[in-house]
Amino acid sequence: SERPVVLFVQQESAMFVLPELESPKIGDLNIDYISYDDREGPEPAFAKFSKSSRFSGLGVESRLIRHLELDLISSHGISSEIVDATDIFAELRMSKSEVEINHMTKAVKIAEESLVSILDRMRAGVTEKQFAAELVIQLLRNGSDTGLPFSPIVASGVNAANPHHFPTDKEFKEGELVIVDWGATHEG
């Protein structure tokens, strides 16, 4: 989101400060939040949070946090020290619960079944865009969340050399290489 979204985590609790329009994404996480709308902006929400919480130190992912969020945290005195905790966050992401592993396994199965179900459509004359669209349809039919992790990359011939290619109206040709990079999500 272009609007500030910050999750503050302490040993026994967590709190989001986020735009009201993002609050449905929290879903069943059972995490408290303070929200704001575009009319008022984030300032009052961060001010409200600062009245209830103070940190002696705050770890952030230095490559991901924007100046906007850092300024809101600093200007409201939420933390006296901000440190780079990128390595800690990376380590935390490596640890998955059984439920998370099951969701990831299901997402892989959805992705594999979706591609296999349309491989017969990968033939000369079909465009990269057409194949990508069919793949998205199959991902959704097979149970992927509507928020795909990324738009499928379908790149044929010379386009296959571009790792971040967006599907075009280029038609597949007989015998040429086709790269497909795709994924599914299941329950987040």
Which residues fall in each region the model found?
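A composition/biophysics-driven feature that prefers long, compositionally simple stretches
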Residues: 1-114
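Generic detector of intrinsically disordered, low-complexity, polar/charged segments
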Residues: 5-6, 32-38, 54-56, 122, ...
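Generic non-transmembrane alpha-helical segments
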Residues: 49, 76, 110-121, 134, ...
